[in-house]
Amino acid sequence: MLNFAYQEHVRSYYFDSRNQDFQFPPLTQIEHADVCVIGAGFFGLSAALELAEKGKKVIVLEGARVGFGASGRSGGQAINGFEEGIDEYIKQVGEDKAHKLWNMSLETIDIIDERIEKYSIQCDWKKGYATLALNERRMDDLIEMEKESHKNFGYQNMQLWDKTKLKQHLGSDIYVGGLFDSNSGHLHPLNYCLGLAKACVDLGVQIFEQSPVVDMVEKNGCVEVKTAKSAVISQDVILATNAYIDVLPKSIHHGINRKILPVESFIIATEPLSQAVADSVINNGMSVCDNNLLLDYYRLSADNRLLFGSDSSSEKDMVAIMRKNMLCVFPQLENVKIDYGWAGPIDMTLNSTPHFGRISPHIYFAHGYSGHGVALTGLAGRIVAEAILGDDERLSIFEGLKVPSVYGGRIIKDLATKIGVQYYKFLDKYR
């Protein structure tokens, strides 16, 4: 069940290996700001940082802890592009705007590079990412992806690998080949999130934890954001709750929760591997996922643990299921111990298209990253900040993308997710 109010971090490898330990106070008195951000994950902190760099007074309200959600639990893979595929966006918004969307997707990685360097964020950032195919039909999809990226956008950072080339870097026999992207990469998500929080605070941003928002009212040209104990009065508000949008009252989300399907993803972390064993798994430091609908994703951590994740719909025997999945890929890890296992929701949309926009002229949102959140959240923070500062050109392009709704509330969403997972399992088995 989704819940975040007053929660502490889940125990995970990321939490135990965090390099900063912030404890921000709860909101106890009325505060005023230019912008109030609801949610202290990647998107909320990225937007706050962009605005603070421009001199805005920003307050961030977090119902739990900084990086409590996917920003502190994800696989840490920063992937450019979009899950839906840029060809669909050409149909929706035309070639010119689709080219702008593609360029923005490349900017997502530049933003990570820039912030890590500018604010000295220690988060084990490493370039290199491969999407792998389990059969020839899915390899054809990767071949087409590389062809379209090069032909339509001139992207030259992708390399097609056949099975022989892949085996030079990955110790698994189950794949027929892959598509390597030298620009995408991976990082320690919680340490990156905590680094963003420190950068925000250093620029004067106020962060309040354990301060879930219970109501929001627009009046007299301002927005009053209410917590259980106090309120923030601001000119503009940014909703940055992502997969937890359903938990908020309708007076806050105004129905945009219908765009989001929270899908549970699970990760295990092995004990530290010897260098020889680590090299037998991945020897070039890349992060990896397959191109199943319910995909496996994995990478080595800075201390040589294998972090292995998959999507599912049940937390029952999660560690055992993840271990079985891991051994299907890397049977050489049969005797390796699992030190950690944790789960968390991903904010998916029905068509995997990100949902960015405005509820009103003073209330902004971005969510629905659909597995691309490590990278896309930085871009979302930048373009929402641009809109608040008076330039909404890039936000307007995202507002033109079609994102279908799911009606019927959380019970229907849970049912739809479970049915969808079973359907995807069927497709993955037979396609």
Swiss-Prot record:
Its EC number is 1.-.-.-. It is an enzyme of class 1 (oxidoreductase). The gene is ordL. Signal peptide: none annotated. Disulfide bonds: none annotated. It holds the Pfam family DAO. Keywords: NAD, Oxidoreductase. SUPFAM superfamilies: FAD/NAD(P)-binding domain (SSF51905). It comes from the Bacteria. InterPro entries: FAD-dep_OxRdtase, FAD/NAD-bd_sf. The keyword NAD applies. GO terms for molecular function: oxidoreductase activity. One of its GO terms (cellular component) is cytoplasm. This is Probable oxidoreductase OrdL.
